[in-house]
């Protein structure tokens, strides 16, 4: 629009030249009546270059320019009230080639078969956040996830349902020099270790961990009539984890130890004054550190009466029940994730989750929350700016995992060289997850890729994003009888580029692409089998990648909780120090 306005101004300025020329011819023709003026003007037009300056030339020029200016002003005023050809909308399709020319760079991410988005966000001024929408069978993995990972030009944190992506791409990333790390909740024996305690720098991080743990283990859509129980569990967990963080040796800072400490929290309903082994431990800490935050939070828990305290303990133990499983204890007793290096060197972190069970998915939620914290810390406190390597979160099956605070991170990650590809089946999923704030997700994704689906609210959403175009319509009318007549009328009306029904019937070979500030594109989905690196993938003939997790190290040191004798059958009578 500013370019068009500039061109119009030049056009009107050039229009003053013929106006001045006509004014000079008119000035030398003035004199006598109207018939003489017409004869003189006709003679002057026969010799248009023979101009004579008279005393009437300047006033005539000024009068003609004033009239010309008023005419232009009147025309522009009327034009400002209309948009020819856009009365009902100006939406139009862009060609894949034109959009690719605007946004593609040497280092880019593939979006469709013919459109790429460059990694240098300062050039095109768009974030790399992508919202991918596609129902089952819409080729979300084959046309988006796998091509992007095989491009291997950023670091990756990947949600991988069923281990399909790890098998197909892990080997190639290894060849490209990536450090491949895996949290495998499908085959726990093939998982690297992840211990959330390793990323606690101070007491504030402990509070974040407990808050994320509570939110991640709360069933989706549950509504508590009384938040007392959740708050009481929170206080107890804060006390125990703070105590381990401040007092225990490194090898006892894990959730296995949290479960063991919970066993020492003995409560007797009939004896309110009963002192449990855990009470004794916190009393000993209070004598040495009267201002301990752990002790203060434990006192909050102890405000509950005997029966209530027992219910809190049971509820907390049930919430943390997965940490009683030997496989989960082995996985969380040590750490191989090294989250602080995610943006420092070539790293690909896979979070393999089952697609038919979400029991352990809270571990991935904790991992991602701490990954964001570690990356933000590295960018803000170490590099004081963007990370050395761009980190992309490829969040397949996004709705399967609660990510507390994700909308806030999505809005702030760009300046730190972090981006997210949020992959959902339909808009109803994020509406259910984020209720009143769901629009912040598409609002912070400068690119939206629609691959197809069969959910009606998504069809309507996509149709509205496409917008309306102004089209010509033709109507026919006919009256019969002796004085019958037939008429044809032409008029303009508005029409969506695609109606919701047409969005539903979109050919499965095609995708709709929206990049902020550009017209929408309909293009073929990316053909994985034509990717330059497909021969290095298991889908192109290479061997599937099998990850072998590390074994937990053997720790030595003085334990926080020590049993008095090796033959003592009752650890509750052990010695605290």
How would you name each of these model-derived features?
Residues 1-138, 142-145, 189, 468, ...:
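Basic- and hydrophobic-enriched, low-structure N-terminal and domain-boundary segments
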Residues 126-418, 433, 501-525, 530-533, ...:
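P-loop NTPase motor domains
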Residues 410-412, 416-512:
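Conserved ATP-driven motor cores of ASCE-family P-loop NTPases powering translocation/secretion/packaging/pilus
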Residues 89-91, 112, 124, 128-129, ...:
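General secondary-structure edge motif
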Residues 32-33, 81, 86, 90, ...:
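Intrinsically disordered, low-complexity regions
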Residues 89-97, 106-107, 112-122, 142-143, ...:
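A broad, low-specificity signal for short, low-complexity segments enriched in glycine/proline
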């Amino acid at each position: 629009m500013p370019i068009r306005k500039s061109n119009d101004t030049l056009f009107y300025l050039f229009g003053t030249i013929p106006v001045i020329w006509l004014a000079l011819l008119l000035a030398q023709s003035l004199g006598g009546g109207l018939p003489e003026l017409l004869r003189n003007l006709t003679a002057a037009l026969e010799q248009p270059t023979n101009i004579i300056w008279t005393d009437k030339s300047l006033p005539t020029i000024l009068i003609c320019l004033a009239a010309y200016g008023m005419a232009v002003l009147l025309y522009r005023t009327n034009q400002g009230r209309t948009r020819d050809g856009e009365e009902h909308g100006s939406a139009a399709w862009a060609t894949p080639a034109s959009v690719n020319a605007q946004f593609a760079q040497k280092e880019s991410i593939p979006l469709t078969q013919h459109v790429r988005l460059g990694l240098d966000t300062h050039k095109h001024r768009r974030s790399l956040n992508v919202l991918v929408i596609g129902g089952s069978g819409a080729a979300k993995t084959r046309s988006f996830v796998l091509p992007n990972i095989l491009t291997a030009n950023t670091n990756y944190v990947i949600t991988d349902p069923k281990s399909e992506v790890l098998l197909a791409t892990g080997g190639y990333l290894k060849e490209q020099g990536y450090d491949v790390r895996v949290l495998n909740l499908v085959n726990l024996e093939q998982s690297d270790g992840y211990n959330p305690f390793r990323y606690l720098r101070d007491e504030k991080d402990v509070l974040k961990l407990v808050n994320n743990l509570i939110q991640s283990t709360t069933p989706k859509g549950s509504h508590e009539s009384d938040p007392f129980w959740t708050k009481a569990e929170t206080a107890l967990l804060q006390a125990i984890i703070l105590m381990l963080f401040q007092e225990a040796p490194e090898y006892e800072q894990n959730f296995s130890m949290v479960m063991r400490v919970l066993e020492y929290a003995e409560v007797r309903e009939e004896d309110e004054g009963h002192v449990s082994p855990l009470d004794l431990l916190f009393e000993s800490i209070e004598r040495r550190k009267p201002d301990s935050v752990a002790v203060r939070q434990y006192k909050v828990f102890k405000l509950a009466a005997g029966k209530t305290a027992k219910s809190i303990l049971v509820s907390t133990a049930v919430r943390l029940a997965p940490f009683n499983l030997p496989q989960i204890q082995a996985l969380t007793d040590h750490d191989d994730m090294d989250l602080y290096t995610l943006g420092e060197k070539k790293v690909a972190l896979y979070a393999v989750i089952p697609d038919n069970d979400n029991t352990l998915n809270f571990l991935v939620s904790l991992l991602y929350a701490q990954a964001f914290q570690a990356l933000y810390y590295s960018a803000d406190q170490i590099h004081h700016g963007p990370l050395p390597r761009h980190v992309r979160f490829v969040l397949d099956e996004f709705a399967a995992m609660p990510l507390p605070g994700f909308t806030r991170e999505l809005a702030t990650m760009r300046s730190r060289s972090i981006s997210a590809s949020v992959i959902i089946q339909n808009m109803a999923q994020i509406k259910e997850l984020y209720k009143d704030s769901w629009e912040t997700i598409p609002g912070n994704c400068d690119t939206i890729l629609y691959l197809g689906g069969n959910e009606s609210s998504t069809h309507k959403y996509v149709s509205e994003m496409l917008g309306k175009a102004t089209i010509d319509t033709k109507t026919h009318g006919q009256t019969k009888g002796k004085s019958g007549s037939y008429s044809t009328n032409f008029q303009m009306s508005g029409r969506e580029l695609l109606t919701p029904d047409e969005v539903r019937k979109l050919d499965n070979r095609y995708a709709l692409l929206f990049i902020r500030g550009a017209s929408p594109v309909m293009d073929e989905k990316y053909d994985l089998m034509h990717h330059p690196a497909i021969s290095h993938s298991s889908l192109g003939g290479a061997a599937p990648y099998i990850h072998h997790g590390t074994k937990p190290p053997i720790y030595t040191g003085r334990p926080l909780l020590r049993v008095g004798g090796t033959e003592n059958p009752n650890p509750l009578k052990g010695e605290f120090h």
